[in-house]
Amino acid sequence: MPNFHRVVITGIGAVTPIGNNIDEYLVGLQTGTNGVSDITLFDPEQHPCKFAAEVKNLQSENFIEAKESKRWDRFSQFGVIAAKQAFNDSGLEITEANASRIGVSIGSGVGGLLTMESQAQILSHKGPKRVSPFTVPMMIPNMATGLAAIALGAKGPSSSVSTACAAGSNAIGDSFRLIQLGKADAMICGGAEASITPLGVAGFASAKALSFRNDSPQTASRPFDAERDGFVIGEGSGILVLETLENAQKRKSRIYAEIIGYGTTCDAHHITAPSPGGVGGAEAIKLAIKDASLSLEKVDYINAHGTSTSANDKNETSAIKSIFRDRSYLIPVSSTKSMTGHLLGGSGGIEAVACILSLTHNFIPPTINYVNPDPECDLDYVPNNAREAQVGVALSNSFGFGGHNVCLAFSKIN
């Protein structure tokens, strides 16, 4: 049997629609802050959906030089800022001696969509010679990883996962596995996304995936509510620093929590719709629990994928019930997307951070805008107000277009 390393979280960073650092994000989760408002990043007048969950008042100059920021897409800026926050928080130092044992993996479902759109406009109106030479490096989805590695000097395993809305969670899970197997000593990992653009909003609207509550946008993201009608697109990044328990103890680091399980599957069913009954998601949950050697009674909280779409919320509820049976009704299940909107490939990162904050501060974030119970969604969704609770083990679900399913298991450190 291989000698698996225990893997702990020693640093966290977040850029979100409800807070641009960990302290702000924690307060937002505890108070049920609503991050949804009218779109300001472009003129949405011609669009059927005119609202989103934007990152607001971000002081990027504290992390990125002004000259550099002009050469980085918005999603990469979010990823690097959150990575620097997490790295600084961890107290980890990268030297020539350890650089090749420290890696980066930041998932993104879409990558540099803003760059792609703006340069396509230049190509169309001004011709090919006016297209920026930075176009390709700005828009490719691995560049948040690349820029973070350059900024921090991390020369170890480097990757960018692109499994749609499961990308951030896959990046964390894959990083966990690398450290567990001894292939790396530490990983900076999570997700980043910035798709609140004309094409991004129009594309999801045409797919009937978005809510169109333009008259009351702050009530639009309502996971598990009977009157849910689509998700609210968000943006931002959540990043963790993972490292071996031995390494963290050796340098006397603060340890937030331990990552103990990872399950990932594919529905192989449909390009956008989940498999009936959420069977693929259920299998990912089952695999994470088995990987963690957990009994079902140990799970204290589930951070749901909870997108506020009819299909996801119903099928995710079914998936949870198929695994936990009668105990499903005793486990608090909440969707922080009710506050942050759906960050697509960035969602797994900020939701992993939410689980870690839940473990360390003993509370469960709410599902806000939960007003009308749905008979098909009949679990405890922690409606509208955060709840004090002793949380020892938390699960985080992420499901993506293409049938990608991920479940991560976190626990207090023993």
Protein language model regions, located:
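Flexible, low-complexity linker/loop segments at domain and module junctions
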Residues: 1-9, 96-99, 292-298, 329, ...
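Condensing-enzyme catalytic core mediating Claisen C-C bond formation in acyl metabolism
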Residues: 6-10, 34-38, 215-292, 300-301
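A glycine- and small-aliphatic-rich helix-loop capping segment at beta-alpha/alpha-beta transitions
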Residues: 23-30, 114-128, 178-181, 201-214, ...
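Active-site-adjacent elements of ketosynthase-type condensing enzymes
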Residues: 44-54, 111-115, 194-221, 263-283, ...
